[in-house]
Amino acid sequence: MRILGVDPGYGIVGIGIIEVSGNRISHVFHGTIETPKDLPAEKRLKRIYEEFLKVLERFSPDECAMEKLFFVKNVTTAIGVGEARGVLLLALAEKNIPVFEYAPNEVKVSLSGYGRASKKQIQENIKRFLNLSEIPRPDDAADALAIAWCHALQSRARRVTHGEN
């Protein structure tokens, strides 16, 4: 099963793709979709949508794991991230890819056993778990891989609980 992890953002969308085969989880790809601050909002969202569709077509994920929008202090940031999530969800719906959402602390628990683990600790763990030579950069891509990893573990647990394995 191929899992696409997404760290949604307005300026930077983190992308992380892993492959789950039996008990093995391997790295496929990580990167970002970036939009310049000087572009009008509608053009930024269009770019996110079009570039994300290219990722979906290139890698054909079976499922998508996305970070839930959580409380943020900056309302403008929250609105931008919400708009970006909207175009990402639209692209996923068009491709009939199921979406699973995870809160940041759920992702941290799945990678460290602790919901308040540091970003550095999570990055080190994702590097180690996926046998990467270095921490994925930028942070948004590392976060997306962590979200995908979380989903791989959660979906495995659901299958075991429901007697599918």
Swiss-Prot record:
Signal peptide: none
Positions that bind Mg(2+) 1: 7, 140
Protein residues bound to Mg(2+) 2: 67
GO biological process: DNA recombination; DNA repair
UniProt-listed Enzyme Commission number(s): 3.1.21.10
Enzymatic reactions: Endonucleolytic cleavage at a junction such as a reciprocal single-stranded crossover between two homologous DNA duplexes (Holliday junction)
A GO MF term: magnesium ion binding
Residues at the active site: 7, 67, 140
Co-factor binding details: Binds 2 Mg(2+) ion per subunit.
CC annotations in GO: cytoplasm; Holliday junction resolvase complex
InterPro entries recorded: RNaseH-like_sf, RNaseH_sf, X-over_junc_endoDNase_Mg_BS, X-over_junc_endoDNase_RuvC
Chief location category: cytoplasm
Pfam family, one: RuvC
UniProt keyword annotations, A-Z: Cytoplasm, DNA damage, DNA recombination, DNA repair, DNA-binding, Endonuclease, Hydrolase, Magnesium, Metal-binding, Nuclease
Compartments reported by the entry: Cytoplasm
Cofactor(s), by name: Mg(2+)
Assembly and binders: Homodimer which binds Holliday junction (HJ) DNA. The HJ becomes 2-fold symmetrical on binding to RuvC with unstacked arms; it has a different conformation from HJ DNA in complex with RuvA. In the full resolvosome a probable DNA-RuvA(4)-RuvB(12)-RuvC(2) complex forms which resolves the HJ.
Protein function: The RuvA-RuvB-RuvC complex processes Holliday junction (HJ) DNA during genetic recombination and DNA repair. Endonuclease that resolves HJ intermediates. Cleaves cruciform DNA by making single-stranded nicks across the HJ at symmetrical positions within the homologous arms, yielding a 5'-phosphate and a 3'-hydroxyl group; requires a central core of homology in the junction. The consensus cleavage sequence is 5'-(A/T)TT(C/G)-3'. Cleavage occurs on the 3'-side of the TT dinucleotide at the point of strand exchange.
Similarity-based family: Belongs to the RuvC family.
Name listed for the protein in its UniProt record: Crossover junction endodeoxyribonuclease RuvC
Organism: Thermotoga petrophila (strain ATCC BAA-488 / DSM 13995 / JCM 10881 / RKU-1)
Origin organism lineage: Bacteria, Thermotogati, Thermotogota, Thermotogae, Thermotogales
